[in-house]
Structure formats: C-alpha cells, structure tokens
C-alpha cells in the first residue's frame, strides 16, 4: 500500500505556520468560515494548473522534486501529468487508478479489487476537491485564517486504515488551493505547490476518456 500511495503522491518540511494549525481545532464559531472556504473550492467544476511536488525521505535525508500539470474534475477524479524528471500520467477516479509511463505502457488498478486502496484513493480525492462531508466523517479538522486572507486547514485521520498511509494533511490558499502538505505513515512530508490555477475550462476529449 505504501508503494501505491507513493505512486500517486509520488512530496519540504512542514513550516511552523503549518504546525500551528493543529493548535486550532474547528469550533462552531469557525465552522461557517470553513464552509465558505470549502464551497469556494467546489464552485468550479474543473480546476487545472501547474504543480511542483517535493517528497522528502527522512531516512536518506533527500528530497525528490517533480513538476507537471494537473486537472481536478469535480466528481470525476484527478489527473496528474508529470513532465519532469520523466513523463508519466496518472488518473484517479472513484473506480480505478490508471497510469501511463513514458513508453506509453498502461497499468490499471480497480478499486473493487483492493478495498483499502479504494478507501485511501477516495480520501485523497475528497481532500483535493474540498468534500466537506467526507472530511468531517474521516478527519479531525483544524482551521485558522490569517490577516491577508490566507486560510489553513489541518486534517488528522480518524480511521486506522487511513492513518497508516496518511498521518496528517495541511491545506492552505487564498482564492484557490495553493499548497497541500501530506505526511505519510512514516512521517515523511510531501509538499504540493500549485500555480497558474484556472477554473471553468472544460475537459479535453482525452482527459474525459481517462476519467471515465
């Protein structure tokens, strides 16, 4: 399962600001603000942009950096098109994970064949799409906002199945989701930084086919 998670996450140590969010459990008073943030994340049916991913492996004190583009397609799933250090394409939907490598070879895993992977995959989709119902069911939620409009959400899994793969998640942004930091089950941080994010651009025929 750790290999499967790495294939998808495949990510810069957490900053002090990120650590601080876990000192701010979600309260009833802040719940409305959180709802507004998550609603904004879900307003666009499609989001696309560029990503930079830094995966830190503490045992060898090394960072692995990759860059590329992404598409988050509402209820359909997520596309990760890695361009560097080598090209690969990953599509995650509710039913499957599909990967295409640089040579064009395709591999696919169906969720029904691996219930644990299916649960982890659906959780990751919910995190990136701002699915409040799923987040409340599966995570302890922490939330804070800054004077400049920056919001930060901290998530700690409730379920042992998820906690073995993802020990914590921190999301932050202004208008759009800008950064996500996941710590895997071994405490290795994985940082995603998003840029050039646009909403409302429809899927291409190829993208649509990959997510169906």
PLM features per residue range, with description:
Residues 51, 78-82, 97-100, 153-155, ...:
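Short hydrophobic/aromatic-rich beta-strand segments that constitute the beta-sheet cores
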Residues 69-118, 190-191, 196:
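An acidic-aromatic
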Residues 15-19:
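Sec/Tat signal peptide C-region and signal peptidase I cleavage site
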Residues 1-4:
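Positively charged n-region of N-terminal signal peptides that target proteins for export
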């Amino acid at each position: 399962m750790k290999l499967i998670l790495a294939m998808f996450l495949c990510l810069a140590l957490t900053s002090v600001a990120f650590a601080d969010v876990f000192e701010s459990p979600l309260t009833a008073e802040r719940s409305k603000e959180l709802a507004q943030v998550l609603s904004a994340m879900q307003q666009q049916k499609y989001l696309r942009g560029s990503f930079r991913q830094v995966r830190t492996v503490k045992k060898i004190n090394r960072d692995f950096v990759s860059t590329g583009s992404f598409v988050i397609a509402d209820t359909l799933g997520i596309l990760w098109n890695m361009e560097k250090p080598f090209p690969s394409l990953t599509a995650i939907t509710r039913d499957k994970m599909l990967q295409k490598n640089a040579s064009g070879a395709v591999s696919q895993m169906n969720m029904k064949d691996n219930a644990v992977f299916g649960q982890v995959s659906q959780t990751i989709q919910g995190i990136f799409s701002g699915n409040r119902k799923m987040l409340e069911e599966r995570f302890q939620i922490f939330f804070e906002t800054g004077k400049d409009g920056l919001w930060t959400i901290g998530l700690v899994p409730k379920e042992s199945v998820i906690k073995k793969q993802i020990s914590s998640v921190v999301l932050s942004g202004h208008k759009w989701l800008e950064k996500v930091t996941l710590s895997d089950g071994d405490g290795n941080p994985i940082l995603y930084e998003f840029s050039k994010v646009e909403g409302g651009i429809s899927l291409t025929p190829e993208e649509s086919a990959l997510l169906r």
